[in-house]
Design a protein with these regions (language model features):
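Interdomain/boundary linker segments immediately adjacent to catalytic/signaling cores
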Residues: 1-75
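Short, surface-exposed basic-aromatic patches at helix termini and helix-loop junctions that form
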Residues: 40-46, 91-94, 114-120
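Beta-rich catalytic cores
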Residues: 85
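Conserved catalytic cores of phosphodiester-cleaving nucleases, focusing on short active-site segments
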Residues: 89-91, 98-104
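Short, mixed charged/polar active-site loops
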Residues: 97-99, 134-135
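Short beta-strand-loop-alpha-helix junction that forms the active-site gateway
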Residues: 102-112
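Acidic, metal/cofactor-coordinating or nucleic-acid-engaging core segments within structured domains
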Residues: 116-145
Length: 145
């Protein structure tokens, strides 16, 4: 079984984590949901790639062709295009890039909010809800179709 699949299966066991940066608008706060997700990436053998500041055009090119991603296999980039842009992580395994965005909602909110207004079809969303104290995953394309 691939490391990315094992990671995603363990994500489904995560409880609710609040995304403090999104909730407060202050990006210097600890974003616990992202931290918990990053901890799982590390537990499953992915290593942080030091290269940051990936241009949005590069991200978009990789999104169109996930096999063109140039970061090393078995690595991930956190906040590749900055804290105010998605995704939260680009993960590469077996030559393919995966785009992972963390979303959380409190009791007051019933649905996740998307920076662009709509989910991105090539993204994997890690969604946690306080009301249910559970996490689920879905593809952006599932919402758009």
């Amino acid at each position: 079984m691939s490391k990315i699949r094992q990671f995603l299966e363990q994500v489904l066991q995560m409880p609710y984590y609040k995304n403090y940066a999104a909730a407060s608008g202050k990006v210097h706060n600890i974003a616990k949901h992202e931290d918990a997700t990053e901890d799982l990436l590390i537990q499953h053998g992915f290593t942080k790639h030091s290269k940051g500041g990936i241009p949005k055009k590069q991200r978009d090119d990789w999104l169109k062709d996930p096999y063109s991603c140039t970061i090393p296999d078995g690595t991930y980039v956190s906040q590749p295009t900055g804290k105010q842009d998605s995704p939260d992580f680009i993960v590469k395994e077996n030559g393919r890039a995966y785009f992972i965005e963390c979303k959380s909602v409190s009791k007051k909110t019933k649905a996740p909010m998307y920076n662009s207004g709509v989910p991105k079809s090539g993204y994997i969303y890690v969604f946690t809800a306080k009301k249910y104290n559970q996490t689920t995953i879905y593809n952006g394309s599932d919402i758009l179709s």
